From Swiss-Prot:
Name assigned to this protein: 5-methyltetrahydropteroyltriglutamate--homocysteine methyltransferase
HAMAP family cross-referenced by the UniProt entry: Meth_synth
Gene that produces this protein: metE
Top-tier EC class: transferase
Residues that coordinate or bind Zn(2+): H652, C654, E676, C737
Functional pathway: Amino-acid biosynthesis; L-methionine biosynthesis via de novo pathway; L-methionine from L-homocysteine (MetE route): step 1/1
Protein task: Catalyzes the transfer of a methyl group from 5-methyltetrahydrofolate to homocysteine resulting in methionine formation.
Amino acid sequence: MSTLTSVSGFPRIGQNRELKKIIEGYWKGANDLAAVKATAAELRAKHWKLQQAAGIDLIPSNDFSYYDQMLDTAILLNVIPQRYARLSFDNQEDTLFAMARGYQGDKGDVTALPMKKWFTTNYHYLVPEVESAAEIKLNSTKPFDEFNEAKALGIDTKPVFIGPYTFLKLARTPEATELELDKGLVNAVAAVYVEVLAKFNELGAAWVQLDEPYLVLDKEPGDVELFKTLYTKILSAKGNVKVLLNTYFGHIADVYETVNLLGFDGIGLDLNEGREENLEAVAKYGVASNTTIFAGVINGRNIWRNNYATSLGLVDALKQVTANVAVSTASSLLHVPFSTEGETGIPAEDLKHFAFAVQKLDELKEVAALADATEDEKKASAALAANQALFDGTRVAADPAVAERIGKLSDADYVRQPAREERQALQREALGLPLLPTTTIGSFPQTKEIRAERAKLRKGEVTKEAYDEFIKAQIDAVIKKQEEIGLDVLVHGEFERNDMVEYFGQNLNGFLFTKNAWVQSYGTRCVKPPIVWGDVSRANPITVEWSAYAQSKTDHVMKGMLTGPVTILNWSWPREDITHEEQTKQLALAIRDEVLDLEAAGIKVIQIDEAALREKLPLRKSDWHVKYLDWAVPAFRLVHSAVKPTTQIHTHMCYSEFNDIIRDIDAMDADVISFEASRGDLVVLDAIHDAHFETEAGPGVYDIHSPRIPSEKEIEDRIYEILDKMDVKKVWINPDCGLKTRGNAETWPSLENLVAAAKAVRAKLDK
């Protein structure tokens, strides 16, 4: 019998971001919901047929979503807070969008659900909110409709769900204690999954996949018992459906013995990020006789080609324990671009080193075929030989100048002088800012006109000189508008930048760029990460000309805007032939050069965004420092350690759980940090207070990911919440994040309310 192949999930935005475009058109009133549904159905059919043509045995369904799979699960379970239910939309999609984006209109005014990073990825999920009065019940036909959709095309699929354990651990359950979820809630959730399996029994599904990535985290008291309670109920009622427990982003060695005894038909193990521990657990505890191990050998989180010899070695190691081994993607392919097809900007000799989602289907099938081959057949295999050739020899030559510069670094290069308290006093005097200074995070809306002008430059339809004049006009206008509404520290708007990471990559040595390698970040927001191809260095100044021009146009303090080294790496496709630490040092030195040039050009405030610092923190607490923070935090210090005491260094961080690393963030030794905080109900304030946080801070006072406009009173209330926990002298007032993806129609009224709120609070404090 040939080795089964299984795909955990497939990208849903479409090869050309069709889903993004049709949904955003619906939000703007350019098309109706029927058009959205038609495009979605076309994409699903295309993606199923692609996987069928590639010969994949277990093709996923229900991995499609209009916005987010956790949000879909909340709706499936009827976990819809009353504030959204009361909007009384006549379709489930508009309720979903209101939960994801907030709503402000004739039906009411509600903020969006909180949004957080999905484990260590750059994907964001909506945090479900389980109200005490929630009636947990099966509330959606989506999984069954999509299964039948595929069946009508002649394709049998494997329905995929976020599992109940992960859902409950990630949901906000206000009435539950930290250690023990309400048993009524647990039983109700389990009952819905039982009902789901019963329906798939009726529909004739062979397999159902339940994703439980939360299993790879450290366990709290009661976690294992919760998992057992849920799955004892679910598996006892599974009927003829085979249940695949799928785990990813780490290992489950600490619970593998328990999982193995529960009676799952399949257990999916990540053999990229949890390789050694998972293999050791399987070797130690064996595999139940009726269980198939799904070996996650095809990495769902990178774009480099799979090393077949390595994958075959992993499959062979499992086959020493059990004959029941399938090969699978290590996680959903949601986190990689669609296809390398059409990437003509990358030389063919380089492109052959990459595999996007479509190419990973072929890799999966080839690994499965080779796993079934005899040793003689492997030796004769052209596919195996061609694959091995990619890993033999040197892919790219090293840059000796980069290595030499890193080799000369000393401990002093990672320490800024004088101490922060002394610097803060000097900076207050030098900058002359008021109490509760107001600023923005950096970017302003990139209108259709700006994007069109950039496209013209790319196509050679306008000269570089004409484009630069256009950008200068945008900068002039945004400076004037910021001055008019009364912001204290201004920014130039970043109109020259397509993306905060790609822009820097395009101006550094060592990067490759794609035309269409988009991946979903949240909802319809997509990103196109650059590829770290070789050693990184800065050839010329990148931002200095624009920042210096902007400063020349105002007497206000102008903030220089940079992306930090950890974020550039975390939001790029990193190399696999050298460590992340080494790549980050290279980037830190390149950005350090830019910081010093900005300072020399008269820029007194420089923001070095580390938006993605938290997201790559290892999932196991014991790994936090030794595998990440011990080099990530010093890399940031290396960037700014040589500036003058009067130069104020800012940083910014995006949606994350900051509380547990708040002291490490303080150790970055920035002068000011802004947090994305409003969707997290400002819980970071308690951590700042309890840690005696020394860095000045601006927890975001309104959510920029929602189109709604916060009132002056709403922002004023937020400021007082902040002042309850922070020293007023250390508080900055700013939005949650950059404003690039917002429209001018909501941006300026929101900022006017922000400035008015800050002034109102200042006035009351002065009395």
